[in-house]
């Protein structure tokens, strides 16, 4: 029997059959002791079926198959609630298309685990800091993303550069303190 992990990596999928098998292998290759939860929105390309089959051979992979295309926001929320309900200590969220490098998960975990007495509740793998990047986007998508993040920082008063990215690590106890209704 596999020892339970205290770390859950959550990724939302819709038609990610082309990338998900490689992503799962890359995550386990970097961090073999983590658990992975794939939240699939009933992908017609077989993503959910692949996940179910692979999870039978690897107890660290879990699948949450939803009835339809409900969207990435609710998929991530379902994954975060799953992590809380299952007693994980840390939750990493990332996209399934390799836009977030699996080998950087350990950097997010190291950052959230460091503490000078004050716990860190969330770490953002920002695209807009030194060392961060975005590859494969057309210029207008870069411009839109920069605009949305600048506007969000200004309106919400957030001291972060990347409000819209999905590469994050959360302390599950902090998530558990939120009202999920």
Q: PLM features: what roles do these ranges have?
A:
Residues 5-7, 28-38, 46, 60-61:
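Short loop->beta transition adjacent to catalytic acidic/histidine clusters or analogous donor-positioning motifs
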Residues 40-49, 98:
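A conserved acidic beta->alpha catalytic loop
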Residues 94, 98-101:
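Hydrophobic, well-structured modules enriched for small/aliphatic residues and gly/pro motifs
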């Amino acid at each position: 029997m596999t020892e339970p992990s205290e770390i859950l990596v959550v990724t939302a999928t819709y038609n990610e059959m082309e990338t998900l098998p490689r992503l799962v292998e890359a995550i386990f290759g970097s961090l073999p002791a983590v658990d992975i939860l794939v939240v699939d929105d009933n992908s017609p390309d077989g993503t959910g079926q692949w996940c179910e089959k692979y999870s039978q051979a690897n107890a660290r992979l879990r699948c949450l198959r939803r009835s339809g295309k409900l969207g990435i926001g609710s998929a991530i929320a379902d994954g975060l609630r799953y992590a809380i309900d299952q007693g994980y200590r840390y939750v990493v969220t990332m996209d399934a298309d390799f836009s977030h490098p699996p080998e950087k998960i350990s950097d997010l975990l190291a950052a959230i685990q460091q503490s000078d007495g004050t716990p860190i509740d969330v770490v953002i793998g920002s695209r807009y800091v030194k060392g961060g990047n975005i590859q494969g986007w057309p210029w207008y998508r870069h411009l839109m993303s920069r605009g949305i993040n600048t506007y969000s920082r200004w309106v919400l008063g957030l001291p972060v550069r990347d409000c819209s990215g999905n590469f994050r690590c959360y302390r599950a106890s902090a998530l558990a303190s939120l009202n999920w209704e």
